[in-house]
Amino acid sequence: MSIKLCPSMMCADFRNLEREIELLESAGADIFHLDVMDGQYVPNFGMGVQDIKAICQCATIKKEVHLMIENPVQYIELFASFGVDIIYIHPEAGYHPITTLQKIKELGLET
């Protein structure tokens, strides 16, 4: 079993995002972890759609999105179009978790 380094980009300095990404990639990061929270499913707010898109445009390593939102299926295609590689959901957050997981797989993403 190998260990992967997956820094959370929620802690990144978004004023210097490209530089942050370069530093983390050159330090050996394997995957960028992107937390999306809607203030409904969980009481906090996390990264927004624009943040995810900006990271995907700059990063050369894999990106994993952790959806802590209600009805995650409605965002799967959007995040896939940005170039994320892995999407995590909470099965109790949507009406049809199996359908959501199938959609992720159909788009060629890991889950």
Model-derived features: where do they sit?
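Conserved N-terminal beta1-alpha1 strand-loop-helix module at the mouth
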Residues: 1-88, 93-96, 103-109
